[in-house]
């Protein structure tokens, strides 16, 4: 007779009891003492029936123990049942095909087949029938039932554990235990999915047999194993059906989406942003905690505004429950009054008011069913503070410089700067979850900045501000985000705290760099080549950096370690040449009256003068004539009555808000200075460099420069004029913080007179300027310091000055 059975349909390999020359026969005979006589196919079926009866009793007891556990798992199965329904239908088709193939083989056994070894019954199966077809039908029903209870496990990762469980279940009783365990060693992995499912069912039943319910420790292990069992579903599903890839990925996305929908903070890791081929952010991380007020700082042109726009446009993964607003565009110019433009920003309030009017009309027509809904509408209106909405809108507009008449003026009658104020008022009125302000003080006068500063200190929601006003950042912000080297770095505290920490960090980096250079010199002096010395130093640096990362719990950089470079400090230095001494009177207005045609006079009988050591800051609300006063002093406006007097040798350097108008846009900055002052090429470039204009911008047409770069060209021009008096009208617009610091230092070092109009509180205080306020058609000096003036401004608006402790 043949040494092996005839070819069967794909089934798990099994070891028969017949004669065989394979090495596994020795293993089987070693553990089976009952294989002394050979049994026919039908005799073995009878033995199987008896074994099935015994197993059935044991399984009934097991089923009672499993019933409680199955009830707990029922809810989980129900949720997964719908998702697996399609897979089960596909599996049923495969099972039917397998059954058809098995039935074709179920013919009366031939002489050779009678001597062929019969398959060993699978452990844990209930063979109720008295023949092979009954056993197969029973197996099929159990497979279908088990597949509904548990999705199939992947066969490959669990190969060893499944084979062990199957070998232990093949025959009951301790008699053949050793032989069964050794038989499993020679057993191949299942050849199809149904065999794998059978093996997993046997494994589950064996685990239930070994882990009794009273043993709580084993119960916990069982639950943990079942959780792992469920996590492995995805891998098997992906291997069997392409559509399962979509469902699994969708489930994962749904889980992430659910987390986002409940998030109150923003956490974005490893994002990159490029603009016009230039990388602005590379593997940067953004963390914004709800309720904190962040200041985003860094040099101009590095991507601060770009980041705000990406957040506002939701180009980054912002949680959908966080409403984001970036105040960047002026309000539409139309017939809408300013106060109504602010009120209409709250669309929820408008919808509730519209519904209230509709329900009131239904009640008047006798429809009593609207009463309940109307009461709920009233509750929502009360909760949103609808009754106080107009008062709130007018308070915000007043703080930003709108008097009662201006609040009712149509927006089309305002200039662009005032429409920007209306837009800012709308943003403050709406109170979004995350409010982003990009240079909010640029279009404001000093009084409006004082009010906004005070108002935002009480802001309870999340705030992200880009500003060049250090005093504003110091008062408002609780955290600073520093954009440096295409990454975002976080510092707790206001700008002053950040500045101290950053300077200390730079000092430490400089010490490390100097230590590294010293080590390189020592290695070279000891006979090492430059390449060897750098390699050895780099290895030592790598170890030290890794130690620092572990200490600070920082993520390890993906970049290859490099030698330290000298820390580059972004420094800007403004310098104005000192003027020669001039005898007084230097510059003054005497009995001046002035007003624009068709308007009320701004000044009447004004007397105002300066000396060479004067440091004066002109303050006052918008529209009172601050810029007009500067134009009268420079001689660009002629008084209606009175006169302007000045020293005949006096040279005035004037920086106007509309400085771009004095530049020739078709020229390069170098050409502009060369033509105006007959300077050599290199001298012109040196002058531009002293005011922080990058070297590559020296030869670009002025029309292609940014606002900040154009401002530096104007400052360079002022220095070339060698003025005796500097008259500056809002000089900090478009300058970054470092440049404003440099301007303040230059003013302090300058020996001539300075008159400035500025909304930057820090520039005013650090230059020790005397405050002169324009009011009631005159100019007068203020008694007290800048804090006294702030208090006076807020009290006039009915506000209370906030004094926040420094963090």
Swiss-Prot record:
Record key words, sorted: Activator, ATP-binding, Cytoplasm, Nucleotide-binding, Nucleus, Phosphoprotein, Repeat
Gene Ontology BP annotations: positive regulation of translation; translational initiation
Record keyword Aminoacyl-tRNA synthetase present: no
Residues that hold ATP 1 according to the record: 298-305
CDD domains in the cross-refs: ABCF_EF-3
Keyword Cell division: no
Binding of ATP 2, residues: 620-627
Residues covered by the ABC transporter domain: 266-510, 587-802
GO molecular function: ATP binding; ATP hydrolysis activity; ribosome binding; translation activator activity
Modifications the protein undergoes after translation, according to the UniProt entry: Phosphorylated at phosphoserine and phosphothreonine. Phosphorylation on Ser-110 and Ser-141 by CK2; inhibits association of EIF2 with ribosomes.
InterPro entries given in the database record: AAA+_ATPase, ABC_transporter-like_ATP-bd, ABC_transporter-like_CS, ABCF_EF3_subfamily, P-loop_NTPase
Cellular localisation: Cytoplasm; Nucleus, Nucleoplasm; Nucleus envelope
Biased composition (Basic and acidic residues): 47-65, 148-161, 208-227, 521-542
Family listed: Belongs to the ABC transporter superfamily. ABCF family. EF3 subfamily.
Role played: Required for efficient Cap- and IRES-mediated mRNA translation initiation. Not involved in the ribosome biogenesis.
Name of this protein: ATP-binding cassette sub-family F member 1
Recorded name of the encoding gene: ABCF1
């Amino acid at each position: 007779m043949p040494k092996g059975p005839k070819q069967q349909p794909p089934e798990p390999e099994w070891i028969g009891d017949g004669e065989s020359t394979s090495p596994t026969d020795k293993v089987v005979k070693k553990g089976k003492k009952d294989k002394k006589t050979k049994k026919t196919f039908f005799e073995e079926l009878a033995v199987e029936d008896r074994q099935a009866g015994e197993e059935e009793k044991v399984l009934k007891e097991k089923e009672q123990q499993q019933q409680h556990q199955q009830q707990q798992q029922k809810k989980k199965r129900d949720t997964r049942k719908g998702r697996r329904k399609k897979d089960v239908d596909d599996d049923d088709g495969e099972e039917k095909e397998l059954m058809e193939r098995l039935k074709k083989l179920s013919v009366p056994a031939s002489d050779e087949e009678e001597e062929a070894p019969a398959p060993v019954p699978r452990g844990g199966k209930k063979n109720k029938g008295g023949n092979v077809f009954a056993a197969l039908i029973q197996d099929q029903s159990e497979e279908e039932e088990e597949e509904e209870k548990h999705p199939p496990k992947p066969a490959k990762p669990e190969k060893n554990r499944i084979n062990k469980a199957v070998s232990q279940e093949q025959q009951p009783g301790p008699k053949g235990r050793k032989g069964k365990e050794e038989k499993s060693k020679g057993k191949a992995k299942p050849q199809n999915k149904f065999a794998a499912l059978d093996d997993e069912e046997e494994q589950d039943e064996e685990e239930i047999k070994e882990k009794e319910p009273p043993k709580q420790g084993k119960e916990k292990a069982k639950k943990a194993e079942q959780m792992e069992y469920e996590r492995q579903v995805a891998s098997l599903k992906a291997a069997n059906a392409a559509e399962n890839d979509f469902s699994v990925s969708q489930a994962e996305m749904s889980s992430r989406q659910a987390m986002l929908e409940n998030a109150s903070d923003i956490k974005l890791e490893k994002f990159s942003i490029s603009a016009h081929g230039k990388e602005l952010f590379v593997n940067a991380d953004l963390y914004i905690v709800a309720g904190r007020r962040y200041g985003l700082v860094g040099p101009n042109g590095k991507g601060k505004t770009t980041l705000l726009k990406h957040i506002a446009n939701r180009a980054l993964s912002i949680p959908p429950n966080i409403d984001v607003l970036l105040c960047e565009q002026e309000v539409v110019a139309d017939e809408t009054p300013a106060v109504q433009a602010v009120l209409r920003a709250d669309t929820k309030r408008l919808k509730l008011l519209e519904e209230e009017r509709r329900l009131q009309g239904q009640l008047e027509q006798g429809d009593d069913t609207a009463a309940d809904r109307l009461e709920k509408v009233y509750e929502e209106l009360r909760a949103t503070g609808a009754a106080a909405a107009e008062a709130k809108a007018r308070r915000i507009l007043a703080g930003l410089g709108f008097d009662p008449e201006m609040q009712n003026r149509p927006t089309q009658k305002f200039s662009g700067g005032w429409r920007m104020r209306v837009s800012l008022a709308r943003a403050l009125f709406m109170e979004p979850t995350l409010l982003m302000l990009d240079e909010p003080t640029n279009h404001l006068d000093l009084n409006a900045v004082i009010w906004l500063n005070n108002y935002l200190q009480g802001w309870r929601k999340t705030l992200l501000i880009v500003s060049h006003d250090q005093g504003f950042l110091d008062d408002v912000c609780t955290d600073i985000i520093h954009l440096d080297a295409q990454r975002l770095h976080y510092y707790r505290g206001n700008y002053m705290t950040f500045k101290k920490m950053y300077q200390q960090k730079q000092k430490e980096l400089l010490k490390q760099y100097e230590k590294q250079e010293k080590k390189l010199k020592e290695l070279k002096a000891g006979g090492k080549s430059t390449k060897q010395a750098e390699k050895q130093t780099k290895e030592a640096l790598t170890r030290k950096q890794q130690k620092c990362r572990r200490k600070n719990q920082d993520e390890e950089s993906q970049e290859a370690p490099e030698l330290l470079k000298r820390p580059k400090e972004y420094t800007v230095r403004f310098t104005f040449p000192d003027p020669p001494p001039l005898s007084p009177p230097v510059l003054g207005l005497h009995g001046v009256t002035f007003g624009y045609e068709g308007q009320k006079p701004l000044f009447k009988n004004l007397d105002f003068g300066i000396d060479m050591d004067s440091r004066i800051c002109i303050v006052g609300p918008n529209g009172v004539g601050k810029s007009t006063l500067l134009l009268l002093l420079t001689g660009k406006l002629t008084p209606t009555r009175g006169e302007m007097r000045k020293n005949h040798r006096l040279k005035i350097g004037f920086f106007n808000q509309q400085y771009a108008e004095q530049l020739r846009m078709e020229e390069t900055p170098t050409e502009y200075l060369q033509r105006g002052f007959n300077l050599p090429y290199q001298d012109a470039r040196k002058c531009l460099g002293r005011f922080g204009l990058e070297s590559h911008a020296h030869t670009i047409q002025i029309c292609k420069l940014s606002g900040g770069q154009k401002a530096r060209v104007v400052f360079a021009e002022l220095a070339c004029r060698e003025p005796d008096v500097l008259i500056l009208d809002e000089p900090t617009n478009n300058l970054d913080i470092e440049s404003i610091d440099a301007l303040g230092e230059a003013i302090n070092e300058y020996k001539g007179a300075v008159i400035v109009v500025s909304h930057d509180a820090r520039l005013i205080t650090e230059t020790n300027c005397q405050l002169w306020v324009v009011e009631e058609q005159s100019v007068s000096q203020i008694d007290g310091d800048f804090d006294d003036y702030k208090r006076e401004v807020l009290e006039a608006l009915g506000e209370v000055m906030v004094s926040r402790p420094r963090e």
